[in-house]
Structures are given as structure tokens and as C-alpha cells.
């Protein structure tokens, strides 16, 4: 996993938390998101938690019934959205707008983990001369990486990312806003697009 400027590269399959083999629900759960709409079988949520969920973190109802796992994290750092891949037998369109989903407190990361670190005050270390193929701009990877958020695999810098084209989202076309969260390749476009199409407009 490569971490870009204050974020992760890779809209999916990132960190899953310290315990990948947890059995049963946690002792307590915290509010994580509110249902917005179903999109191609997934649940699209607006985050109502100040922290960022782990990828693949289990998501529960208030009664601790697991309904799926975090699939993708999207949007700018000050307005985070995420999708849930429903568990077998759970229908994304069975929920209504405003329904809340919950997460275990051990599956959250502080937002500060994804913000740029302050510049160090003091003399700069001397660079060694010579050598081919040095690190670029601090050695944080190339195009498609995150700048202040989650960057997608070959996707946009921030903004909303998707899987090979429009899949319903908020911003379309190439790129998106810097300092956000992206998915896998391409742009997730405006909510209500079809996979492989062009992204929507604001």
C-alpha cells in the first residue's frame, strides 16, 4: 500500500484494520453513515462520523446485525461518502434515505492521518549527488495517487473515482477536486450513470 500526500492510493482493498478475523459483532457500535441511495447493488452512504472507516470494515445496523462491508471511500476530506457491499441476502434498495449504519470503534482512523504533514522547520538535509531514477517529489508515487485524500488506481486526483467509468456519483470527467477520495480508475461521475459511461456534471 502506498500512501500519497495525506491519504491512500487505491480505492479498494486497502487497510482492513488490526483484526481481520473478528468473529461476531463488537461490544459497542458507533454511527458511521446515513443511507443515500442504492447504486448497482451497492449502498451509497454519507459519512456522519468524524473518522474514516477501514476498507472492508464490517457495517452493522443499530442492533449489531451485519449488513455488509465498506467497499469504497469517496469525496473530499470535508464531506466523505462511502459505499457498502451488502452481505448475501441483503438488498441495497431495501433501505430508505436517512437510515443509519454503524461500525465498530476499532475500525476507524482519525482524519488527521490523511492530512498533509506540516513542514519541518530547520536546515534541509544535503542531497546526495548522482544516482539515476531518484524519488519524485518526496517519493510518494506517480499519477493517480492521492493528494490530501484517497486516490484511485489510475483514477482521479481526489474527487469521486469509479471502476472504469461512470457508476453514479457526484463529479464526472477526468480528475475531480484535489484533496478527496477516489475509486478504481476513471471517474464515478454523477449518481445515476451506467458503468463504463461518461461521468456526470455538477
Curated annotation (Swiss-Prot):
Origin species, per record, is Scheffersomyces stipitis (strain ATCC 58785 / CBS 6054 / NBRC 10063 / NRRL Y-11545) (Yeast)
Quaternary structure and interacting proteins, as annotated? Component of the small nucleolar ribonucleoprotein particles containing H/ACA-type snoRNAs (H/ACA snoRNPs).
Provide the gene name from the record: GAR1
Which parts of this chain are annotated as the region Disordered? 1-26, 113-202
* GO molecular function terms attached to this record: box H/ACA snoRNA binding
Q: Supply one GO CC term from the record.
A: box H/ACA snoRNP complex
UniProt region (RGG-box 2), positions on chain: 137-200
Compositional bias of kind Basic and acidic residues: 114-123
Outline the segment boundaries, as ranges, of region: RGG-box 1. 5-17
Q: What is the annotated localization of this protein?
A: Nucleus, Nucleolus
- Organism superkingdom: Eukaryota
Compositional bias (Gly residues): 1-16, 130-202
BP GO annotations: snoRNA guided rRNA pseudouridine synthesis
What's this protein's name?
A: H/ACA ribonucleoprotein complex subunit GAR1
Asked if the record carries the keyword Ligase, the reply is no
Amino acid at each position: 500500500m502506498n500512501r500519497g500526500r495525506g491519504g491512500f492510493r487505491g480505492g479498494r482493498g486497502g487497510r482492513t484494520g488490526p483484526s481481520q478475523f473478528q468473529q461476531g459483532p463488537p461490544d459497542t457500535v458507533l454511527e458511521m453513515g446515513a443511507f443515500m441511495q442504492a447504486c448497482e447493488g451497492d449502498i451509497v452512504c454519507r459519512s456522519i462520523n468524524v473518522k474514516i472507516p477501514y476498507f472492508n470494515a464490517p457495517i452493522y445496523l443499530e442492533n449489531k446485525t451485519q449488513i455488509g462491508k465498506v467497499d469504497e471511500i469517496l469525496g473530499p476530506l470535508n464531506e466523505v461518502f462511502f459505499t457498502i457491499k451488502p452481505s448475501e441476502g441483503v438488498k441495497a434498495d431495501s433501505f430508505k434515505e436517512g437510515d443509519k449504519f454503524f461500525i465498530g470503534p476499532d475500525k476507524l482512523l482519525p482524519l488527521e492521518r490523511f492530512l498533509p504533514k506540516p513542514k519541518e522547520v530547520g536546515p534541509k538535509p544535503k542531497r546526495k549527488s548522482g544516482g539515476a531514477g531518484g524519488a519524485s517529489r518526496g517519493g510518494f508515487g506517480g499519477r493517480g495517487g492521492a493528494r490530501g485524500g484517497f486516490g484511485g488506481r489510475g483514477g482521479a486526483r481526489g474527487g469521486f473515482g469509479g471502476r472504469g467509468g461512470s457508476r453514479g456519483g457526484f463529479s464526472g470527467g477526468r480528475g475531480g477536486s484535489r484533496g478527496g477520495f477516489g475509486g478504481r480508475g476513471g471517474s464515478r461521475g454523477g449518481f445515476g450513470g451506467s458503468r463504463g459511461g461518461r461521468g456526470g456534471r455538477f
